[in-house]
From Swiss-Prot:
HAMAP family: Maf. It is found in: Cytoplasm. This is dTTP/UTP pyrophosphatase. Nucleoside triphosphate pyrophosphatase that hydrolyzes dTTP and UTP. May have a dual role in cell division arrest and in preventing the incorporation of modified nucleotides into cellular nucleic acids. Gene3D superfamilies: 3.90.950.10. Keywords: Cytoplasm, Hydrolase, Nucleotide metabolism. It comes from Geobacillus sp. (strain WCH70). GO terms for molecular function: dTTP diphosphatase activity; UTP diphosphatase activity. Its cofactor is a divalent metal cation. The keyword Glycoprotein does not apply. The keyword Hydrolase applies.
Length: 186
């Protein structure tokens, strides 16, 4: 069987690939994840996903390498992972009662070519109270997640509805990713 590598240390992406019953290994890429303001959100996540995959694929050229990057976009503003609890609260206030998009760029590099795509999911939040925001932040859950929330955790209670791929919001559009890996011959 050809080697499949996830170029990410994200526990959520690992869990999703395990859900798909794929045999893979994890080799986190250590790249500068700075998003340049001149890029559109779509270009930024695609470029970061490619850089992550390329950093690993350069050392494993005969393997299939998956890189991914996820951001939350609200009114053309990219919301990455909050650096402080105050920043997390500000992000959640922004998203409260509003719709936003979750974008995941995926790069699959293989000996048979590559697949690069961006998946977009629209998420609608209920109005959040300050108590809900602070109780959620106190769990520590939002601190390692783009947009300061994890739809698969307690923040599921904030979500009114979504349009698109649920797993994309978690961190990897699973169905499309698996189909692309197989299309490339894995």
């Amino acid at each position: 069987m050809k080697q499949l590598i996830l170029a990410s240390s994200s526990p959520r992406r690992k869990q999703l690939l395990e859900l798909a019953n794929l045999r893979f290994q994890i080799l986190a890429s250590h790249i500068d994840e700075q998003i340049h303001e001149t890029k559109s959100p779509e270009q930024a996540v695609q470029l970061l996903a490619y850089r992550k995959a390329k950093a690993v694929a350069d050392h494993y050229p005969h393997s299939y390498v998956i890189g991914a990057d996820t951001v939350v976009v609200y009114q053309d503003n990219i919301l990455g992972k909050p650096k402080t609890e105050e920043e997390a609260a500000a992000m959640l206030r922004m998203l409260s009662g509003n719709e936003h998009h979750v974008l995941t760029g995926v790069a699959i590099l293989s000996p048979n070519g590559q697949s690069l795509f961006v998946e977009k999911t629209k998420v609608f939040f209920w109005d959040l109270t300050e108590e809900e925001i602070f109780d959620y932040i106190a769990t520590g859950e939002p601190m390692d997640k783009a947009g300061a929330y994890g739809i698969q955790g307690r923040a599921a209670l904030f979500v009114k509805r979504i349009e698109g791929d649920y797993f994309n919001v978690v961190g990897l559009p699973l169905s499309r990713t698996v189909r692309e890996v197989k299309r490339l011959g894995w």
